[in-house]
Amino acid sequence: MKTQIEQAREGIITPQMAAVAAEEHVSPEYVCRMVAEGKVVIPWNHVRAPKAVGIGKGLRTKVNASIGTSSDIVDYEAEVRKARAAQESGADTLMELSVGGDLDRVRREVIAAVDLPVGNVPLYQAFCEAARKYGDPNRLDPEMLFDLIERQCADGMAFMAVHCGINLYTIERLRRQGYRYGGLVSKGGVSMVGWMMANGRENPLYEQFDRVVGILKKYDTVLSLGNGLRAGAIHDSSDRAQIQELLINCELAEMGREMGCQMLVEGPGHVPLDEVEGNIQLQKRMSGGAPYYMLGPISTDVAPGFDHITAAIGAAQSSRFGADLICYITPAEHLALPNEEDVRQGVKAARVAAYIGDMNKYPEKGRERDREMSKARRDLDWQRQFELALYPEDARAIRASRTPEDEATCTMCGDFCASRGAGRLFAGDLRGDKV
């Protein structure tokens, strides 16, 4: 069975490409061309057939929500509820990142609970199983890892974050650098680095990259090139280790595309705002325009409890400058395993950020909704305001909780409503359109 990218290169518009085109209000031919060039990916798996979602050039910036158990908290029903909450709140994709309990069970229950494309990180389960079996994760047999990747794809994974870009040279780059204020913050990355150092061997995911691609190609699963050496602090952003891994991942993205696999490149998670544009330009240039998956990014390290906001600020910038997929961050980041409400807040913040970014990335089509909202506010048309809101129910609930005496106004201004005053002063004079 041919993959989306292989069919696109033959000029075949698949049902998934047609569905993406209809959702995005672009032509099927455009989607087909972008998939063929590797500038758009459609997370997919013929075993499960999730909702078709396009990620990449010329399309709306998408939002991913990550859930999963930890070694401290294992509640399968809670993870299913979080998955559903993410979908209800507007997430476009979902990553199941459990490291505690029965990992096959939670993955399968989450996949069954939503129709979104679901992704994961195979290294998590691989090292968990090695630790349980041998008492030491560094005794992981690479064959066990490849078997696990196959098993997870067979369960219906639509995309998979695989840490192929860590190799012995990137580790040496990190060591020569002589500092890392935030250390290593990728669970999969630090586990693979530990395995490589303990065994004195190359990363099997890098060494046998063609084997990884072969497995994912069989299912048409998107290969998302994970960033195990990403910066976990803004003062580590764009350091040599991070850029070295990005360089390798961009090379691998090109190789994977040539082999007929859809490729996604992952970006960093902590980036000061002045470095966002350059980071994205570098990735796009080196990868040949592969879709870029930014993990936030968090734009300051001193606001725990509010990292859904710090990440939303970074995400708006990322979307504006060309990032294609944003991973949400919840208020619980750096503090605790997120609960259902954290998930909802994280998705909503990321969606608002992505919308703001798209307004600037696609100004010709991204601002009409805002113009209509402005007119509805000017005219005190509350029903129209709710219809245009990104989250109508949230807006309705706030207004209903503080009912004004005059239904035309709100309790912020009441009798001193500026919109009503302007309407009386200028009547129909302000209802024209800008030339």
Swiss-Prot record:
Q: Please give the biological process terms from Gene Ontology that the record holds.
A: cobalamin biosynthetic process; thiamine biosynthetic process
**Essential cofactor(s):** [4Fe-4S] cluster
Which residues of the sequence carry a binding annotation for substrate? M95, Y124, H163, S186, K187, G188, N227, G228, L229, R230, E266, Y293
Which superkingdom heads the taxonomic lineage of this protein's source? Bacteria
GO molecular function annotations of the record: 4 iron, 4 sulfur cluster binding; lyase activity; metal ion binding
| InterPro entries the UniProt entry points to | ThiC/Bza_core_dom, ThiC/BzaA/B
Per the record, what are the reactions this protein catalyses? 5-amino-1-(5-phospho-beta-D-ribosyl)imidazole + AH2 + S-adenosyl-L-methionine = 5-hydroxybenzimidazole + 5'-deoxyadenosine + formate + L-methionine + A + NH4(+) + phosphate + 2 H(+)
Entry keyword set: 4Fe-4S, Cobalamin biosynthesis, Iron, Iron-sulfur, Lyase, Metal-binding, S-adenosyl-L-methionine, Zinc
The residues that hold [4Fe-4S] cluster are C410, C413, C417
Quick one: which residues bind Zn(2+)?
A: H270, H334
Quote the EC number: 4.1.99.23
Q: What does the protein in this record do?
A: Catalyzes the conversion of aminoimidazole ribotide (AIR) to 5-hydroxybenzimidazole (5-HBI) in a radical S-adenosyl-L-methionine (SAM)-dependent reaction. Is thus involved in the anaerobic biosynthesis of the benzimidazole lower axial ligand of the cobamide produced by G.sulfurreducens.
Q: Which family is it part of? A: Belongs to the ThiC family. 5-hydroxybenzimidazole synthase subfamily.
- Spell out the subunit comment: Homodimer.
UniProt name for this protein: 5-hydroxybenzimidazole synthase
Q: What is the protein's species of origin?
A: Geobacter sulfurreducens (strain ATCC 51573 / DSM 12127 / PCA)
